[in-house]
Swiss-Prot record:
Subunit annotation: Interacts with Spx.
Family per similarity comment: Belongs to the SpxH family.
Record's subcellular location: Cytoplasm
Swiss-Prot/TrEMBL keywords: Cytoplasm
InterPro entries documented for this protein: Adapter_SpxH, Thioredoxin-like_sf
Protein name (database record): ClpXP adapter protein SpxH
Function according to Swiss-Prot or TrEMBL: Adapter protein required for efficient degradation of Spx by ClpXP under non-stress conditions. Interaction with Spx stabilizes Spx and exposes the C-terminus of Spx for recognition and proteolysis by ClpXP.
Primary gene name: spxH
One Pfam family matching this protein: Thioredoxin_5
Cellular component terms per the entry's GO annotation: cytoplasm
Lineage, highest ranks first: Bacteria, Bacillati, Bacillota, Bacilli, Bacillales
Amino acid sequence: MNAKHRVTSHCDHELGICGISPEANEALPAKKPLEIYTFIDPLCAQCWSMEPILKKLKVEYGHYFRIRVLLAGKLNVWNACEAGKAKYTRPPVWVKGVSSSNMPYAGDIKLSDFHPYKASLAIKAAELQGPKAGHRFLRKLRETLFLQKQNITNEDVLKACANAAGLDVDAFIADLHSPSAAKALQCDVQTTNEMDVDTVPTFVFFNDNSEEAGIKISGQYPFSIYVQLLEDMLGFVPVKATPPTLEGLLQTYGFLATAEVAMVLDLSSEEAEKKLKTLMLQQKVEAVPYEYGTFWKWLM
């Protein structure tokens, strides 16, 4: 979208993106041509650290793609766990990787009592209520793990996450123990193996209008790399949505880290924090500090 077409910031809750005015919607594709397979592990610190980049990609170019979340677990390990009864054996140092990103977290997390199968199964159960419900649940799940240091493989904690994400909690619990969620998770693992995904996070970009193979990228790269991948898959330079205002962004997402605000709005961390503190003085947001960073809760 060039400068002469800029309009007042708008957030489309159906599209799940900001910066698209009703007038500008006419210039956007009616059907999203791309799909991004996002291979993650809900206990993975590096996956959590990707949130600012993914948020910016959705806000600016979300009208071109859908995101499909796949759980890249180890099926042979889960089978040996008898459907999640065995405990997690990765050392706590695995979670210390969050400190290398700007995403806040509450300190080192002991994973020895975690059951990884249960957390992944819960995400598939949430997705049975729709993709948006699944995305909301995944976000709450990560916040509960990395910010509150709770055991997200505990069923009571999972119920609380489902409630906070606006899910039908009774249906969620029923689905958690149903063959449907287990089958969906098995499909994720099968896809993970078929695509030779051996590390998380990994992203595979597909064009629904092309028979060509997708493009796979593992790990974290500068934002410009992901935009270039979108351009390569689309075959043209994608139109960037009008950037949202700070208040519009917070109103849409409700609870954001300083790093997410800074990334989406192209601000330094210091600039973002200054603007957020101004809103705090106006009693529009509440600062929620953690040991390694701050989140901001929209109050209006």
